Amino acid sequence: MLLPHKALVQIEVSRYSFVKRRPNGSVDFVSPFPSLFSYGSVHGVMADDGDPQDALVVGCAPRRGEAVEYPVWGQVFFVDAGVADHKWIVGPRQPSEVQWAMVEGFFRLYAWAKRWMSLWRGLSGETACKGVERKPSVAG
């Protein structure tokens, strides 16, 4: 999918929260470690898994319930129980090298936790972080 220039994101998980929520506000699961990023759903965009497109916010920390609009800088290629579940990376400014590394490291650890949850829920299929793609910069 071609990434858009900007995305309007409804925040469902505040940065440092342990609770992963569904778009309707119900609890999906409690993580063994906190989210390093605010996380939510993109308004008006459906993902391949049938849910609203996921997005994480890098560079600031909007709280659960807020709606924020930021440029899209890239995406995390993620597979959850055999289904593509990519996450757009948004924020007020282009992520630094350290932030890019944090995003990839976090989602590799997150994949490990999700694999265990999938096993517990009786789901099969691969769960993995397949890497991070940076949106090409536009020379101005």
Task: Report each predicted region and the residues it spans.
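Hydrophobic N-terminal alpha-helices or hydrophobic patches in metabolic proteins across all domains
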Residues: 1-140
